[in-house]
A protein has these predicted regions:
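Mature extracytoplasmic domains of secretory-pathway proteins
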Residues: 48-124
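Proline-rich intrinsically disordered, low-complexity coils
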Residues: 8-10, 38, 51, 90, ...
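N-terminal export/targeting and maturation segments
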Residues: 1-74
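Solvent-exposed, acidic/flexible segments
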Residues: 17-25, 94, 98, 123, ...
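Intrinsic disorder/low-structure terminal segments
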Residues: 6, 14, 113, 174-175
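C-terminal partner/receptor-binding element of secreted or periplasmic proteins
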Residues: 121-178
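Residue-identity detector for glutamine
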Residues: 23, 55, 60, 88, ...
């Protein structure tokens, strides 16, 4: 069994990310990982949780920083640590929590700010959050508000995998097969 605290925290290298994708993924991991968000993990579990982003757009701030507007997904792979008898066919159940967010990186690529829409808000309040998160991209804010918070597709996904299964397999191959 691999316990939740024995799964390595992913890096951009885990998914062969480079450039802006690497920077925004490293920021996502710094926001959401088992050390900084222990409330998502339970003692004795064998769960893995990975962040994933669907980028809807990006813009430059007045300060010259880059803000990424994303669907910030927290992907849960339940009981994975007990299902690793065959690394190429791991056994687990999964789900993802999705939320509209913005991640702002400085000119050096370091995390400057993270803003996430609040859960349980009414339509008017969500619209305000969407406009705050989207900044000057008002058409995107309107589209997100009309869709109820999450768009089915974005510009691209980070890491760029075609499924949650592919993401967890790439993670396992990187940390456990090498």
């Amino acid at each position: 069994m691999v316990a939740y605290d024995e799964f390595p925290i992913p890096t951009a290298d885990t998914f062969s990310l480079t450039g802006g994708d690497a920077q925004v993924y490293e920021a996502a991991v710094s926001i959401f990982n088992r050390k900084d968000c222990p409330e998502y993990f339970s003692e004795g579990s064998s769960d893995l949780i990975l962040p994933m982003l669907v980028q809807y757009g990006k813009y430059q701030t007045d300060e010259g920083n880059t803000t990424y507007v994303v669907n910030f997904a927290r992907c849960f792979f339940f009981d994975l640590g007990n299902g690793l008898g065959d690394m190429q066919n791991p056994v687990y159940t999964s789900t993802c929590l999705n939320n509209l967010a913005s991640i702002t990186l400085g000119k050096d690529g370091a995390l400057v700010a993270f803003t996430e829409a609040k859960d349980g808000t009414d339509d008017g309040e969500f619209s305000r959050f969407a406009h705050e998160i989207c900044g000057p991209m008002t058409d995107l804010a309107e589209e997100i508000t009309a869709a109820g918070g999450i768009l089915p597709e974005g510009e691209h996904q980070v890491p760029n995998v075609n499924s949650y299964e592919a993401m967890v397999q790439q993670y396992l191959d990187y940390f456990f097969e090498g």
